[in-house]
Every structure is written in structure tokens, then in C-alpha cells.
Amino acid sequence: MTMKKVSGDLAKNRDYLDRQLGVGESFDVLYRNVEIGKKNAALYMIDGFCKDEVMQKLLQHFIGITKEQMPEDAAEMSRQLVPYGEVDLCGDLDEICRQVMSGVTALLLEGYEQGILIDARTYPARSVGEPEKDKVLRGSKDGFVETIVFNTALIRRRIRSTQLRMEMLQAGKTSHTDICLLY
């Protein structure tokens, strides 16, 4: 199995990740273009898996970094300028895709040949209990709730495939109810 290496060219990395992760196809795959120390950067994450407060603090911190503070490589960047404990590096775009699908946030920067993986995930969970009418002998006891993002995050937690797509649609002339088509 060949490894798809992270390139120093952010546009190439973005093209590959956008295709693999389904950016623009799946509503829950979030992409954010940011500038960190005058370098273009891209953040990828799954809605419902990332802690909003942590991501907000990270973005605020990244925006405040100056060009002079920017290290030459991703290893130094992760050590010096990523204010979060659970940080890893990855040079394989396919592994970055797998990590994003499991809830990790990926940061790629122009000129860096490694991605920075920030584990700020939180998994959706329900209180212990099983549906009263759908008793099963074995298997998952997960059940859906009223919040669609919570439900799609539950599905992503079980099916971590880059091939899974989720399209948000609306049904009903009056209610405009949100529905999600998964394929």
C-alpha cells in the first residue's frame, strides 16, 4: 500500500483532502481556511466531534501568531505554538483522512510536509438505557435523538469511512424539516 505524502504545497493537500473527505458534499465535514503567521493553513474536522470551545480558543491563538514567530517545520510548530496537550504529526494524507473521520482535527500549513493532528474530540453519547420497543440481544444500544448533528455524529462514530457522504435536505412545504441523506 503506497502512502500519499503530505506536500509542502497546501493547494495540493487541500485538493486531495477535499476529494477524499467530501468537502462540499457532506454537510458535517467542516473545512476552515485560516492564516497563521502570514502562512495559509487549512483546518479539517467533523461537526459533532470537536469541542467548540477548544476550537474557538485555538483559532483565536492562531490568528495572533506573527510571521516572526512561525517555525520552519510542523514539529516545531506543534511544540511551540499549538496550545493543546494532545497533538501529533502525520506525513500521510490517507492517515490524516482516517484521523479526521475518527474525530481528530487536522491542521495543514503552506510549506510544511507534515500535518498537525489535534485531538480535541468529544464523542456523542447517551445515558445508559436501551429503546423500550426495539430490544436486541446483542449489538449497539445507540438510539437517535432530536438533534440531527448529534445523530450524524453517532453514525460517523460507527462508520469512519471517507466514502460515507451526508447531504442535508429539507422536506415539507410548511415545516421545512431538516433531513439528512446518507450514502
Question: Locations of the language-model features?
Answer:
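Membrane-embedded alpha-helical signal segments
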Residues: M1-L182
